[in-house]
């Protein structure tokens, strides 16, 4: 279950590196190209993957990721197609941790246990349900434990100590630390006074904290690692490269390669 995350973070620590984790929506802009995009992210040096399953209801996403959802849905992508892509990625890359970032409606629509089981069968390691805070997560957590999937929780920068304690106790895999409150995306740059939150998470022995929201530049990755995060997630900036190169596949894949290499290089201490 969380073993791929445990192994990854242990190996990175030995090498004095942080994790760079790109996010994309599965099926954006279509099924065939989506596999190539995810394949490119891994072969360019991504340490783990955070992936979305397209759904029409995405509350915490900024416009860039909403548009990725729309592109994928308009191309006719189905949840079955998404699981096909996940299965192919897992077969090609047996060791990389794969996480899904979703909303509760999508999980409910498929039946919680059935959905988690499908994820496990496709090679998924973790699930983060963006609109389910830790204190409301029992039904998901129990099934995650039973099935063998890590349940990831979001630690907001304005979280109380008791919330951070709860997240530390209940989460597994890693902790998704928000660098700011609001919707995702590079439209608002990440602000970084997160050292205090990171210190608390360490004190409570939380799963490794990874900073996300508004991470689009190598120096933000460096700052995150310097502040004590185990890695950084970049969603909107990655998706923007897809959006800006829809009509030029080779340029898109080249730019994604360059972006991942540059962001990964920033995790080296």
Swiss-Prot record:
InterPro entries: Aldolase_TIM, RibuloseP-bd_barrel, Trp_synthase_suA. Pathway: Amino-acid biosynthesis; L-tryptophan biosynthesis; L-tryptophan from chorismate: step 5/5. One of its GO terms (cellular component) is cytosol. Keywords: Amino-acid biosynthesis, Aromatic amino acid biosynthesis, Lyase, Tryptophan biosynthesis. The active site is at 50 (proton acceptor), 61 (proton acceptor). The keyword Lyase applies. The keyword Amino-acid biosynthesis applies. Its EC number is 4.2.1.20. Disulfide bonds: none annotated. It catalyses: (1S,2R)-1-C-(indol-3-yl)glycerol 3-phosphate + L-serine = D-glyceraldehyde 3-phosphate + L-tryptophan + H2O. GO terms for molecular function: tryptophan synthase activity. Tetramer of two alpha and two beta chains. Belongs to the TrpA family. The alpha subunit is responsible for the aldol cleavage of indoleglycerol phosphate to indole and glyceraldehyde 3-phosphate. This is Tryptophan synthase alpha chain. It comes from Francisella tularensis subsp. holarctica (strain LVS). The lineage of its organism: Bacteria, Pseudomonadati, Pseudomonadota, Gammaproteobacteria, Thiotrichales.
């Amino acid at each position: 279950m969380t073993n791929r995350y445990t192994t990854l973070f242990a190996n990175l620590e030995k090498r004095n590196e942080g994790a760079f984790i790109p996010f994309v929506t599965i099926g954006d802009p279509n099924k065939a190209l989506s596999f190539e995009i995810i394949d490119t992210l891994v072969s360019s040096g991504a340490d783990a993957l955070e992936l979305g399953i397209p759904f029409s209801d995405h509350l915490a996403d900024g416009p860039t990721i909403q548009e990725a959802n729309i592109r994928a849905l308009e191309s006719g992508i189905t949840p079955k197609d998404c699981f096909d892509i996940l299965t192919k990625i897992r077969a090609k890359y047996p060791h990389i941790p794969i996480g899904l970032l979703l909303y509760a409606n999508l999980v409910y629509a498929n039946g919680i246990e059935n959905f988690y089981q499908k994820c496990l069968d496709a090679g998924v390691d973790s699930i983060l349900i963006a609109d389910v805070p830790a204190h409301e997560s029992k039904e998901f957590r129990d099934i995650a434990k039973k099935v063998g999937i890590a349940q990831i929780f979001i630690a907001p920068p304005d979280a109380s100590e008791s919330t951070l304690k709860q997240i530390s106790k209940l989460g597994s895999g890693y902790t998704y630390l928000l660098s700011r409150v609001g919707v995702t995306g590079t439209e608002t740059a990440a602000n970084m006074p997160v050292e205090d939150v990171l210190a608390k998470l360490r004190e409570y022995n939380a799963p490794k904290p990874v900073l996300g929201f508004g991470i689009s530049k190598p120096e933000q990755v460096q700052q995150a690692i310097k502040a004590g995060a185990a890695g950084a997630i970049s969603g909107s900036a990655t998706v923007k490269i897809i959006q800006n190169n829809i009509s030029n596949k080779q340029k898109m894949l080249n730019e994604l390669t360059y972006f991942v290499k540059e962001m990964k290089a920033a995790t080296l201490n």
